[in-house]
Protein backbone atom coordinates (compact mmCIF):
# COMPACT_ATOMS: atom_id res chain seq x y z
CA UNK A 1 0.00 0.00 0.00
CA UNK A 2 1.46 3.35 -1.07
CA UNK A 3 1.36 6.56 0.93
CA UNK A 4 -1.00 8.04 -1.64
CA UNK A 5 -3.51 5.24 -1.11
CA UNK A 6 -3.60 6.00 2.59
CA UNK A 7 -4.41 9.68 2.04
CA UNK A 8 -7.23 11.66 0.53
CA UNK A 9 -4.92 12.81 -2.30
CA UNK A 10 -4.94 11.43 -5.79
CA UNK A 11 -1.73 9.83 -7.08
CA UNK A 12 -0.98 12.97 -9.10
CA UNK A 13 -1.55 15.25 -6.07
CA UNK A 14 0.60 13.01 -3.86
CA UNK A 15 3.44 13.07 -6.41
CA UNK A 16 3.33 16.88 -6.59
CA UNK A 17 3.40 17.08 -2.80
CA UNK A 18 6.41 14.76 -2.58
CA UNK A 19 8.33 16.78 -5.18
CA UNK A 20 7.51 20.00 -3.29
CA UNK A 21 8.84 18.53 -0.05
CA UNK A 22 12.07 17.38 -1.73
CA UNK A 23 12.51 20.82 -3.31
CA UNK A 24 11.89 22.45 0.08
CA UNK A 25 14.49 20.22 1.80
CA UNK A 26 17.00 20.86 -0.99
CA UNK A 27 16.56 24.63 -0.67
CA UNK A 28 17.42 24.28 3.03
CA UNK A 29 20.65 22.38 2.13
CA UNK A 30 19.24 19.24 3.74
CA UNK A 31 20.56 17.02 0.93
CA UNK A 32 20.83 13.86 3.04
CA UNK A 33 17.21 14.12 4.17
CA UNK A 34 16.09 14.94 0.63
CA UNK A 35 17.96 11.94 -0.83
CA UNK A 36 16.55 9.63 1.85
CA UNK A 37 13.02 10.78 0.99
CA UNK A 38 13.81 10.31 -2.74
CA UNK A 39 14.77 6.73 -2.08
CA UNK A 40 11.71 6.08 0.10
CA UNK A 41 9.42 7.53 -2.58
CA UNK A 42 11.26 5.87 -5.46
CA UNK A 43 12.01 9.17 -7.18
CA UNK A 44 15.47 8.67 -8.81
CA UNK A 45 17.50 11.79 -9.54
CA UNK A 46 17.27 11.25 -13.30
CA UNK A 47 13.47 11.67 -13.17
CA UNK A 48 13.56 14.55 -10.65
CA UNK A 49 16.83 16.36 -11.08
CA UNK A 50 17.91 19.69 -9.64
CA UNK A 51 16.53 21.63 -12.60
CA UNK A 52 13.05 20.22 -12.05
CA UNK A 53 13.39 20.66 -8.30
CA UNK A 54 13.95 24.39 -8.90
CA UNK A 55 10.47 24.59 -10.41
CA UNK A 56 8.98 23.40 -7.10
CA UNK A 57 10.93 25.73 -4.83
CA UNK A 58 8.58 27.94 -2.75
CA UNK A 59 5.53 25.91 -3.76
CA UNK A 60 5.18 24.24 -0.36
CA UNK A 61 5.38 27.58 1.46
CA UNK A 62 2.73 29.05 -0.89
CA UNK A 63 0.43 26.10 -0.27
CA UNK A 64 0.94 26.42 3.47
CA UNK A 65 0.21 30.15 3.57
CA UNK A 66 -2.84 29.54 1.35
CA UNK A 67 -4.14 27.01 3.87
CA UNK A 68 -3.61 29.49 6.70
CA UNK A 69 -5.44 32.23 4.79
CA UNK A 70 -8.25 29.81 3.96
CA UNK A 71 -8.51 28.71 7.57
CA UNK A 72 -8.71 32.34 8.72
CA UNK A 73 -11.38 33.04 6.12
CA UNK A 74 -13.38 30.04 7.32
CA UNK A 75 -13.16 31.30 10.90
CA UNK A 76 -14.23 34.79 9.79
CA UNK A 77 -17.18 33.35 7.86
CA UNK A 78 -18.18 31.24 10.84
CA UNK A 79 -18.14 34.34 13.05
CA UNK A 80 -20.16 36.32 10.51
CA UNK A 81 -22.62 33.46 10.15
CA UNK A 82 -23.08 33.33 13.92
CA UNK A 83 -23.64 37.11 14.00
CA UNK A 84 -26.21 37.01 11.19
CA UNK A 85 -27.93 34.05 12.79
CA UNK A 86 -28.17 36.00 16.03
CA UNK A 87 -29.62 39.01 14.20
CA UNK A 88 -32.19 36.84 12.45
CA UNK A 89 -33.14 35.16 15.70
CA UNK A 90 -33.53 38.52 17.41
CA UNK A 91 -35.71 39.87 14.61
CA UNK A 92 -37.62 36.83 13.41
CA UNK A 93 -40.91 35.38 14.67
CA UNK A 94 -39.20 32.23 15.95
CA UNK A 95 -36.77 34.17 18.11
CA UNK A 96 -39.46 36.51 19.35
CA UNK A 97 -41.56 33.48 20.20
CA UNK A 98 -38.66 32.02 22.17
CA UNK A 99 -38.09 35.29 23.97
CA UNK A 100 -41.73 35.54 24.86
CA UNK A 101 -41.85 32.15 26.49
CA UNK A 102 -41.34 34.44 29.48
CA UNK A 103 -43.41 37.37 28.23
CA UNK A 104 -43.48 39.47 31.40
CA UNK A 105 -41.37 42.18 29.74
CA UNK A 106 -42.83 42.00 26.24
CA UNK A 107 -44.21 45.28 24.94
CA UNK A 108 -45.76 46.06 21.57
CA UNK A 109 -43.23 47.49 19.14
CA UNK A 110 -43.50 48.90 15.66
CA UNK A 111 -44.08 48.32 12.94
CA UNK A 112 -47.36 46.49 13.52
CA UNK A 113 -47.68 42.97 12.16
CA UNK A 114 -50.81 44.02 10.25
CA UNK A 115 -52.71 47.19 9.49
CA UNK A 116 -56.29 46.17 8.75
CA UNK A 117 -58.26 48.50 6.51
CA UNK A 118 -61.92 48.45 5.52
CA UNK A 119 -63.90 50.69 7.85
CA UNK A 120 -65.06 53.90 6.19
CA UNK A 121 -65.19 55.92 9.43
CA UNK A 122 -63.27 55.96 12.74
CA UNK A 123 -62.95 52.80 14.81
CA UNK A 124 -64.39 53.01 18.32
CA UNK A 125 -63.57 49.63 19.87
CA UNK A 126 -61.79 46.31 19.32
CA UNK A 127 -62.26 42.96 21.08
CA UNK A 128 -60.52 39.56 20.87
CA UNK A 129 -62.41 36.28 20.61
CA UNK A 130 -61.35 34.17 23.62
CA UNK A 131 -60.75 30.98 21.63
CA UNK A 132 -60.03 31.70 18.00
CA UNK A 133 -57.78 34.21 16.26
CA UNK A 134 -60.75 36.46 15.59
CA UNK A 135 -60.92 40.15 16.37
CA UNK A 136 -64.03 42.33 16.27
CA UNK A 137 -63.82 46.03 15.44
CA UNK A 138 -66.63 48.57 15.87
CA UNK A 139 -66.91 51.73 13.82
CA UNK A 140 -68.83 54.93 13.35
CA UNK A 141 -69.72 53.56 9.90
CA UNK A 142 -72.49 51.53 11.68
CA UNK A 143 -70.73 48.20 11.12
CA UNK A 144 -68.72 45.58 12.97
CA UNK A 145 -65.94 43.77 11.16
CA UNK A 146 -64.54 40.37 12.12
CA UNK A 147 -60.87 39.86 11.28
CA UNK A 148 -58.44 36.96 11.52
CA UNK A 149 -55.63 38.72 13.38
CA UNK A 150 -53.13 35.88 12.74
CA UNK A 151 -53.58 36.10 8.97
CA UNK A 152 -54.48 39.77 8.71
CA UNK A 153 -57.64 39.01 6.74
CA UNK A 154 -61.24 40.22 6.89
CA UNK A 155 -63.66 37.39 7.69
CA UNK A 156 -67.01 39.17 7.56
CA UNK A 157 -68.88 42.44 8.11
CA UNK A 158 -71.83 42.60 10.52
CA UNK A 159 -74.64 45.02 9.74
CA UNK A 160 -77.66 45.72 11.91
CA UNK A 161 -77.07 48.89 13.87
CA UNK A 162 -78.52 52.02 12.30
CA UNK A 163 -76.03 54.43 13.85
CA UNK A 164 -72.41 54.40 15.03
CA UNK A 165 -71.30 51.23 16.84
CA UNK A 166 -69.47 52.42 19.97
CA UNK A 167 -68.25 49.27 21.71
CA UNK A 168 -67.88 45.49 21.31
CA UNK A 169 -67.01 42.67 23.70
CA UNK A 170 -66.76 38.87 23.59
CA UNK A 171 -68.00 36.73 26.49
CA UNK A 172 -71.11 35.03 27.75
CA UNK A 173 -72.16 31.69 29.23
CA UNK A 174 -69.70 28.84 29.58
CA UNK A 175 -69.13 27.13 26.26
CA UNK A 176 -71.27 29.62 24.36
CA UNK A 177 -69.20 32.66 23.46
CA UNK A 178 -71.21 35.63 22.22
CA UNK A 179 -70.33 39.01 20.78
CA UNK A 180 -72.09 42.04 22.25
CA UNK A 181 -72.24 45.45 20.58
CA UNK A 182 -73.77 48.78 21.54
CA UNK A 183 -74.60 51.82 19.50
CA UNK A 184 -75.73 55.40 19.21
CA UNK A 185 -79.04 53.90 18.06
CA UNK A 186 -79.67 53.17 21.80
CA UNK A 187 -79.61 49.39 21.33
CA UNK A 188 -77.40 46.47 22.32
CA UNK A 189 -77.08 43.52 19.97
CA UNK A 190 -75.93 39.96 20.64
CA UNK A 191 -74.23 38.01 17.84
CA UNK A 192 -73.49 34.27 17.79
CA UNK A 193 -70.01 33.44 16.42
CA UNK A 194 -70.94 29.75 16.27
CA UNK A 195 -73.79 30.55 13.85
CA UNK A 196 -71.96 32.80 11.38
CA UNK A 197 -72.39 35.75 13.74
CA UNK A 198 -76.16 35.74 13.45
CA UNK A 199 -77.85 38.56 15.39
CA UNK A 200 -79.72 36.46 17.96
CA UNK A 201 -81.05 39.20 20.22
CA UNK A 202 -81.45 42.98 20.43
CA UNK A 203 -81.71 44.60 23.86
CA UNK A 204 -83.72 47.79 24.30
CA UNK A 205 -84.09 49.86 27.45
CA UNK A 206 -81.64 52.74 27.40
CA UNK A 207 -83.04 56.16 26.50
CA UNK A 208 -79.90 57.54 24.90
CA UNK A 209 -76.58 56.55 23.28
CA UNK A 210 -75.12 53.29 24.66
CA UNK A 211 -71.37 53.89 24.80
CA UNK A 212 -69.93 50.86 26.61
CA UNK A 213 -70.78 47.19 27.00
CA UNK A 214 -68.98 44.38 28.84
CA UNK A 215 -69.73 40.79 29.82
CA UNK A 216 -69.57 40.22 33.57
CA UNK A 217 -67.24 37.31 34.48
CA UNK A 218 -68.97 34.14 35.62
CA UNK A 219 -67.01 33.44 38.80
CA UNK A 220 -68.57 36.13 40.98
CA UNK A 221 -71.72 35.95 43.11
CA UNK A 222 -73.42 38.21 40.61
CA UNK A 223 -71.98 36.44 37.60
CA UNK A 224 -75.04 34.25 37.03
CA UNK A 225 -72.99 31.69 35.13
CA UNK A 226 -71.65 34.26 32.67
CA UNK A 227 -75.12 35.39 31.64
CA UNK A 228 -74.75 39.00 32.79
CA UNK A 229 -73.90 41.93 30.58
CA UNK A 230 -73.34 45.50 31.78
CA UNK A 231 -73.88 48.61 29.68
CA UNK A 232 -73.28 52.34 30.14
CA UNK A 233 -75.37 55.02 28.50
CA UNK A 234 -75.71 58.75 27.97
CA UNK A 235 -79.02 58.45 29.86
CA UNK A 236 -76.71 58.57 32.95
CA UNK A 237 -77.35 54.92 33.91
CA UNK A 238 -75.69 51.54 33.91
CA UNK A 239 -77.81 48.49 33.19
CA UNK A 240 -77.31 44.80 33.94
CA UNK A 241 -78.82 42.41 31.41
CA UNK A 242 -79.48 38.67 31.35
CA UNK A 243 -78.27 37.67 27.90
CA UNK A 244 -80.26 34.42 27.91
CA UNK A 245 -83.58 36.26 28.24
CA UNK A 246 -82.70 39.72 27.00
CA UNK A 247 -84.22 41.30 30.11
CA UNK A 248 -82.72 44.19 32.04
CA UNK A 249 -82.32 42.86 35.59
CA UNK A 250 -80.90 46.00 37.25
CA UNK A 251 -80.65 49.70 36.49
CA UNK A 252 -77.83 51.44 38.35
CA UNK A 253 -78.09 55.18 38.94
CA UNK A 254 -75.60 57.50 40.56
CA UNK A 255 -73.63 59.33 37.88
CA UNK A 256 -74.51 62.99 37.46
CA UNK A 257 -73.62 62.90 33.78
CA UNK A 258 -72.90 60.40 31.02
CA UNK A 259 -70.98 57.31 32.26
CA UNK A 260 -68.97 56.77 29.11
CA UNK A 261 -67.15 53.58 30.12
CA UNK A 262 -67.69 50.60 32.40
CA UNK A 263 -65.47 47.64 33.32
CA UNK A 264 -66.21 44.55 35.45
CA UNK A 265 -63.73 43.05 37.92
CA UNK A 266 -62.20 39.64 37.25
CA UNK A 267 -64.38 38.00 39.93
CA UNK A 268 -67.61 39.51 38.61
CA UNK A 269 -68.48 41.24 41.88
CA UNK A 270 -67.42 44.79 41.12
CA UNK A 271 -68.04 47.37 38.41
CA UNK A 272 -65.94 50.43 37.68
CA UNK A 273 -67.63 53.23 35.74
CA UNK A 274 -66.49 56.68 34.72
CA UNK A 275 -67.56 59.48 32.44
CA UNK A 276 -68.53 63.07 31.86
CA UNK A 277 -69.06 63.90 35.55
CA UNK A 278 -65.25 63.55 35.91
CA UNK A 279 -65.76 60.88 38.57
CA UNK A 280 -65.06 57.16 38.73
CA UNK A 281 -67.40 54.97 40.77
CA UNK A 282 -66.78 51.54 42.26
CA UNK A 283 -69.97 49.47 42.47
CA UNK A 284 -70.55 46.30 44.48
CA UNK A 285 -73.01 44.13 42.56
CA UNK A 286 -72.50 41.04 44.71
CA UNK A 287 -75.57 41.67 46.86
CA UNK A 288 -79.26 41.92 46.12
CA UNK A 289 -78.91 45.57 45.12
CA UNK A 290 -75.89 47.30 43.54
CA UNK A 291 -74.15 49.72 45.90
CA UNK A 292 -71.66 52.48 45.16
CA UNK A 293 -68.77 51.91 47.57
CA UNK A 294 -66.32 54.59 46.44
CA UNK A 295 -66.38 57.75 44.33
CA UNK A 296 -63.05 58.92 42.92
CA UNK A 297 -62.52 62.57 41.99
CA UNK A 298 -59.40 64.19 40.61
CA UNK A 299 -59.62 64.51 36.84
CA UNK A 300 -60.24 67.99 35.47
CA UNK A 301 -62.14 66.97 32.35
CA UNK A 302 -64.41 64.19 31.08
CA UNK A 303 -63.16 60.67 31.79
CA UNK A 304 -63.11 58.40 28.75
CA UNK A 305 -61.82 55.00 29.91
CA UNK A 306 -61.28 52.83 32.98
CA UNK A 307 -59.83 49.44 33.86
CA UNK A 308 -59.31 47.23 36.92
CA UNK A 309 -55.70 46.30 37.57
CA UNK A 310 -54.93 42.55 37.45
CA UNK A 311 -53.69 40.91 40.64
CA UNK A 312 -50.26 40.50 39.02
CA UNK A 313 -49.80 44.26 39.30
CA UNK A 314 -50.60 44.40 43.02
CA UNK A 315 -46.95 44.24 44.23
CA UNK A 316 -46.04 47.27 42.09
CA UNK A 317 -49.18 49.27 42.86
CA UNK A 318 -49.08 48.48 46.58
CA UNK A 319 -45.59 49.96 46.70
CA UNK A 320 -46.78 53.02 44.79
CA UNK A 321 -49.63 53.40 47.27
CA UNK A 322 -47.29 53.06 50.24
CA UNK A 323 -49.09 49.97 51.50
CA UNK A 324 -47.08 47.74 53.81
CA UNK A 325 -48.78 44.57 52.60
CA UNK A 326 -49.60 43.40 49.11
CA UNK A 327 -53.32 42.58 48.78
CA UNK A 328 -54.19 38.91 48.22
CA UNK A 329 -54.39 37.81 44.61
CA UNK A 330 -57.99 36.66 45.02
CA UNK A 331 -59.09 40.21 45.83
CA UNK A 332 -60.26 41.58 42.51
CA UNK A 333 -60.83 45.32 43.01
CA UNK A 334 -57.76 46.60 44.83
CA UNK A 335 -56.46 49.03 42.20
CA UNK A 336 -57.92 50.82 39.19
CA UNK A 337 -56.91 53.15 36.37
CA UNK A 338 -58.79 55.93 34.59
CA UNK A 339 -57.97 58.01 31.53
CA UNK A 340 -59.32 61.46 30.76
CA UNK A 341 -59.61 64.37 28.40
CA UNK A 342 -57.30 66.19 30.81
CA UNK A 343 -54.49 64.11 29.19
CA UNK A 344 -53.83 62.28 32.45
CA UNK A 345 -54.02 58.71 33.65
CA UNK A 346 -54.80 58.24 37.32
CA UNK A 347 -54.15 55.14 39.40
CA UNK A 348 -56.46 54.54 42.37
CA UNK A 349 -56.70 52.19 45.32
CA UNK A 350 -59.99 50.71 46.50
CA UNK A 351 -60.34 53.42 49.16
CA UNK A 352 -60.60 55.99 46.38
CA UNK A 353 -57.16 57.46 46.93
CA UNK A 354 -55.24 58.56 43.84
CA UNK A 355 -51.87 56.85 44.23
CA UNK A 356 -50.24 58.10 41.03
CA UNK A 357 -50.83 60.50 38.16
CA UNK A 358 -49.23 59.47 34.86
CA UNK A 359 -48.50 62.42 32.60
CA UNK A 360 -47.01 62.42 29.12
CA UNK A 361 -49.84 62.31 26.60
CA UNK A 362 -50.46 65.55 24.71
CA UNK A 363 -54.15 64.95 24.06
CA UNK A 364 -57.19 63.03 25.30
CA UNK A 365 -56.44 59.58 26.73
CA UNK A 366 -58.80 57.17 24.98
CA UNK A 367 -57.89 53.64 26.03
CA UNK A 368 -56.09 51.62 28.70
CA UNK A 369 -54.87 48.02 28.91
CA UNK A 370 -52.87 46.44 31.72
CA UNK A 371 -50.08 44.05 30.78
CA UNK A 372 -51.26 40.58 31.94
CA UNK A 373 -47.99 40.10 33.84
CA UNK A 374 -48.81 43.23 35.82
CA UNK A 375 -45.66 45.26 35.28
CA UNK A 376 -46.89 47.65 32.61
CA UNK A 377 -49.90 49.76 31.70
CA UNK A 378 -50.57 50.53 28.03
CA UNK A 379 -52.39 53.70 26.98
CA UNK A 380 -53.49 55.25 23.70
CA UNK A 381 -54.57 58.80 23.01
CA UNK A 382 -55.56 61.44 20.51
CA UNK A 383 -51.90 62.51 20.33
CA UNK A 384 -51.43 59.57 17.91
CA UNK A 385 -49.27 57.58 20.30
CA UNK A 386 -49.28 54.43 22.37
CA UNK A 387 -47.40 54.73 25.65
CA UNK A 388 -46.09 52.01 27.96
CA UNK A 389 -45.81 52.84 31.66
CA UNK A 390 -43.60 50.74 33.95
CA UNK A 391 -45.41 50.30 37.26
CA UNK A 392 -42.26 48.82 38.82
CA UNK A 393 -40.50 52.15 38.15
CA UNK A 394 -43.08 54.42 39.78
CA UNK A 395 -45.11 54.59 36.58
CA UNK A 396 -42.27 55.82 34.38
CA UNK A 397 -43.06 56.00 30.66
CA UNK A 398 -40.57 53.54 29.19
CA UNK A 399 -41.80 53.40 25.60
CA UNK A 400 -43.72 55.62 23.21
CA UNK A 401 -44.90 54.33 19.85
CA UNK A 402 -45.40 57.24 17.49
CA UNK A 403 -45.15 57.82 13.78
CA UNK A 404 -47.19 54.76 12.86
CA UNK A 405 -50.63 56.20 13.63
CA UNK A 406 -51.97 58.74 11.15
CA UNK A 407 -54.73 59.96 13.45
CA UNK A 408 -56.35 59.69 16.86
CA UNK A 409 -55.90 56.29 18.55
CA UNK A 410 -59.29 55.49 20.04
CA UNK A 411 -58.95 52.08 21.68
CA UNK A 412 -56.55 49.32 22.74
CA UNK A 413 -57.03 45.71 23.83
CA UNK A 414 -54.66 42.97 24.98
CA UNK A 415 -55.57 39.44 23.89
CA UNK A 416 -56.93 37.39 26.83
CA UNK A 417 -54.77 34.66 28.30
CA UNK A 418 -55.50 30.96 28.58
CA UNK A 419 -55.27 28.80 31.70
CA UNK A 420 -53.83 25.28 31.80
CA UNK A 421 -57.31 23.81 32.13
CA UNK A 422 -58.30 25.47 28.88
CA UNK A 423 -60.51 28.18 30.38
CA UNK A 424 -60.29 31.90 29.94
CA UNK A 425 -57.52 33.47 31.95
CA UNK A 426 -56.56 37.00 32.86
CA UNK A 427 -59.36 39.51 32.65
CA UNK A 428 -61.40 37.70 29.99
CA UNK A 429 -63.42 36.10 32.73
CA UNK A 430 -66.25 34.66 30.65
CA UNK A 431 -65.71 31.02 31.51
CA UNK A 432 -65.47 30.05 27.88
CA UNK A 433 -63.28 27.00 27.09
CA UNK A 434 -60.17 28.10 25.29
CA UNK A 435 -57.45 26.32 23.38
CA UNK A 436 -53.86 26.86 24.49
CA UNK A 437 -51.89 29.35 22.48
CA UNK A 438 -49.10 31.77 23.24
CA UNK A 439 -46.38 31.66 25.83
CA UNK A 440 -46.97 30.28 29.27
CA UNK A 441 -46.83 32.80 32.07
CA UNK A 442 -46.81 32.46 35.84
CA UNK A 443 -49.84 31.11 37.62
CA UNK A 444 -50.57 28.50 34.97
CA UNK A 445 -51.85 31.09 32.47
CA UNK A 446 -50.62 31.09 28.91
CA UNK A 447 -50.17 34.70 27.95
CA UNK A 448 -50.78 35.81 24.40
CA UNK A 449 -48.53 38.72 23.50
CA UNK A 450 -50.94 40.32 21.08
CA UNK A 451 -52.25 43.89 21.24
CA UNK A 452 -54.81 45.53 18.95
CA UNK A 453 -55.51 49.22 18.49
CA UNK A 454 -58.19 51.12 16.62
CA UNK A 455 -57.75 54.56 15.15
CA UNK A 456 -58.91 57.10 12.63
CA UNK A 457 -56.53 57.66 9.72
CA UNK A 458 -57.82 60.51 7.61
CA UNK A 459 -61.53 59.73 7.56
CA UNK A 460 -61.13 55.94 7.58
CA UNK A 461 -60.68 53.61 10.52
CA UNK A 462 -57.74 51.23 10.81
CA UNK A 463 -56.95 48.33 13.12
CA UNK A 464 -53.34 47.59 13.93
CA UNK A 465 -52.08 44.28 15.29
CA UNK A 466 -48.92 44.19 17.39
CA UNK A 467 -47.76 40.65 18.08
CA UNK A 468 -44.65 38.66 18.97
UniProtKB/Swiss-Prot annotation:
Positively regulates the activity of the minus-end directed microtubule motor protein dynein. May enhance dynein-mediated microtubule sliding by targeting dynein to the microtubule plus end. Required for nuclear migration during vegetative growth as well as development. Required for retrograde early endosome (EE) transport from the hyphal tip. Required for localization of dynein to the mitotic spindle poles. Recruits additional proteins to the dynein complex at SPBs. Residues 13-45 form the LisH domain. InterPro entries: Dynein_regulator_LIS1, G-protein_beta_WD-40_rep, LIS1_N, PAC1-like_LisH-like_dom, WD40/YVTN_repeat-like_dom_sf, WD40_repeat_CS, WD40_repeat_dom_sf, WD40_rpt. This is Nuclear distribution protein PAC1-2. The keyword Coiled coil applies. Self-associates. Interacts with NDL1 and dynein. Keywords: Cell cycle, Cell division, Coiled coil, Cytoplasm, Cytoskeleton, Microtubule, Mitosis, Repeat, Transport, WD repeat. GO terms for cellular component: cytoplasm; microtubule; microtubule associated complex; spindle pole. Belongs to the WD repeat LIS1/nudF family. Dimerization mediated by the LisH domain may be required to activate dynein. Its main location: cytoplasm. One of its GO terms (molecular function) is dynein complex binding. It is found in: Cytoplasm, Cytoskeleton; Cytoplasm, Cytoskeleton, Spindle pole. GO terms for biological process: cell division; establishment of mitotic spindle orientation; microtubule sliding. The keyword Cell cycle applies. Residues 66-92 form a coiled coil. WD repeats lie at residues 118-159, 161-201, 205-251, 254-293, 298-358, 360-399, 404-429, 430-468.
Amino acid sequence: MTMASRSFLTDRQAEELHKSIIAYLTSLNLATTANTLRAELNLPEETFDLAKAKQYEGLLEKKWTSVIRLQKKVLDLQAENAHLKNEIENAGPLALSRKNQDPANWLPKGPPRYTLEGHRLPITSVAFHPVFSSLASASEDNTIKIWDWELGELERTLKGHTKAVLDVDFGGPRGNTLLASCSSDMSIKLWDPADQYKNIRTLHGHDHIVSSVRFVPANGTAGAGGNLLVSASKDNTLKLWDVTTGYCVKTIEGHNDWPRAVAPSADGRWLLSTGSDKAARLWDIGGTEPECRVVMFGHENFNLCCEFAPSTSYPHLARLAGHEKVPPANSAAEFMATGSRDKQIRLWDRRGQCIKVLEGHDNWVRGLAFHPAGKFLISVADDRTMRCWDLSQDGKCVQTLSGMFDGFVSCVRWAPGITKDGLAGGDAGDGTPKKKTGAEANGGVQMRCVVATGSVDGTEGKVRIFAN
